[in-house]
């Protein structure tokens, strides 16, 4: 379950999301690997869920590794808002 205001980062391949997981675990950034919520579509069935508190750090690490998410959404009011412009 995705909490209110949390972010969901989607990668369009299982390889990329698993690589992101490995990098973020090494960097000790707080996140969860989750199934992509039904309301969102993706070629990959997994996504990263993280809080607004770690958003800047997490996205910077992934960008430095050349592994930015393909899409970014934020849970707000029970819906997922497209936050890809924040990438």
How would you describe each model-predicted region?
Residues 55-87:
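C-terminal structural segments of small proteins and small subunits
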């Amino acid at each position: 379950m995705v909490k209110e205001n949390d972010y969901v980062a989607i990668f369009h391949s299982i390889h990329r999301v698993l690589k992101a997981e490995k990098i973020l675990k090494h960097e000790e950034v707080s996140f969860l690997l989750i199934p992509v919520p039904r309301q969102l579509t993706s070629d990959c069935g997994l996504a990263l869920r993280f809080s607004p508190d770690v958003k800047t750090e997490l996205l910077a690490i992934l960008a430095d590794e050349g592994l930015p998410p393909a899409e970014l959404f934020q849970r707000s009011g029970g819906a997922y808002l497209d936050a890809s412009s924040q990438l």
